[in-house]
């Protein structure tokens, strides 16, 4: 589609084109008037959008809309002021331009996980992790890792998990005394229960959280899924590695403030927490840099509680680069294709 990418929006430009509605609500202002408040996106990024006409019905979440708008700025952050909006008709747009996607094929990322399971020598962990991947099923191929924060993209859960797995391989070259099977198992299963926590369509757009997700959350549900997988594989629930894996799931947020009722209590659990945090924050920062010009600070990012600076990197253009999903994704070696790559990572 021939239209301006969200990642390259600048203040005062006019925009007419197609975008995907990630959130869509009718709200009431302090003076009692109604307005539309939406998050609209293409595959390069998203932007908050307002339409000050309270008579317009909010488009369904996940719908493609055609808008005519102007890019404004509010509290140092770009915002879209919509003048006209309508739902798009099939055939008017190219969905591949609108859906944020992981930069690598889902099948390739999934192969990295199954390769790690095949490498395991611990039969208990191998059986449990393999069964949990089977329990996740086809939804794992398209599910995002979050609704709005890190890896909020089609196949984002696989992107997050496979990136963490490569980071874990690198960590093991520095700390070879860690239990590789236990660390790999924790990485692969730690967020699988997000599939039960969120409602996502096949485009990777999360419309809401499930009742299960709101009442229990993915940490608690993850523990029950580890135990269920062990039961299915006829592994006693008092087997120590079952308990260790349950602890890794419930402690991977690190602190009670962030949802973990127990802090990590053994080295592999501690390492899982930091690998998870590093990968999530690097993904967020990468997205922030793509929409922030070199030499400028971003708006305050509430999830990081700070602004982020985009340095003048050598050889980089001043304008924000398009998101990786908008380019041809760099090809990574497959898990079984490059032993030198595996040795380094």
Language-model segments: which ranges?
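Divalent metal-coordination and catalytic microenvironments
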Residues: 19, 62, 164, 249, ...
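Short, acidic/hydrophobic/Gly-rich beta-strand patch recurrent on exposed beta strands
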Residues: 37-42, 200
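OB-fold single-stranded nucleic acid-binding module
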Residues: 23-34, 46-50, 54-96
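Acidic/His-rich, divalent-metal-binding segments that scaffold phosphate/diphosphate chemistry
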Residues: 94-213, 234
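Acidic, low-complexity intrinsically disordered tails
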Residues: 311-345
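Divalent metal-dependent catalytic cores for phosphoryl transfer on phosphate-bearing substrates
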Residues: 149-150, 159, 170-294
């Amino acid at each position: 589609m021939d239209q301006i990418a969200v990642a390259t929006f600048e203040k005062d430009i006019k925009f007419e084109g197609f975008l995907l509605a990630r959130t869509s609500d009718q709200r009431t202002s302090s003076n009692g008037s109604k307005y539309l408040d939406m998050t609209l996106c293409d595959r390069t990024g998203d932007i908050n959008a307002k339409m000050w006409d309270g008579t317009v019905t909010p488009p369904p979440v996940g719908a493609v809309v055609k808008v005519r708008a102007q890019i404004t700025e509010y509290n140092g952050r770009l915002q879209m002021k919509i003048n006209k909006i309508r739902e798009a008709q099939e055939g008017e747009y190219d969905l591949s331009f609108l859906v944020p996607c992981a930069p690598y094929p889902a099948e390739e990322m999934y192969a990295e996980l199954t390769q790690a399971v095949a490498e395991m020598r611990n039969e208990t962990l191998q059986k449990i992790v393999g069964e949990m991947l089977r329990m996740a099923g086809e939804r794992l191929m398209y599910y995002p890792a979050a609704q709005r924060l890190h890896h909020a993209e089609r196949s984002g859960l696989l992107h997050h998990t496979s990136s963490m797995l490569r980071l874990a391989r690198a960590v093991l070259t520095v700390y070879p005394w860690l239990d590789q099977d236990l660390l790999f198992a924790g990485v692969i299963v730690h967020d699988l229960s997000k599939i039960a926590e969120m409602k996502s369509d096949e485009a990777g757009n999360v419309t809401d959280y499930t009742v299960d997700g709101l009442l229990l959350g993915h940490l608690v549900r993850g523990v029950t899924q580890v135990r269920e997988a062990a039961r299915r594989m006829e592994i006693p629930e008092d087997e120590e590695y079952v308990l260790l894996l349950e602890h890794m799931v419930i402690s991977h947020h690190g602190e009670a403030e962030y949802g973990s009722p127990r802090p990590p209590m053994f080295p592999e659990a501690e390492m899982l927490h930091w690998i998870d945090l590093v990968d999530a924050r690097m993904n967020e920062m990468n997205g922030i840099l793509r929409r922030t010009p070199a030499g400028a600070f971003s708006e305050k990012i509430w999830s990081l509680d700070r602004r982020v600076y985009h340095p003048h990197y050598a050889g980089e253009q001043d304008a924000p680069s398009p998101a990786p999903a908008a380019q041809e994704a760099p090809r990574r070696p497959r898990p079984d294709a490059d032993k030198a790559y595996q040795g380094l990572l």
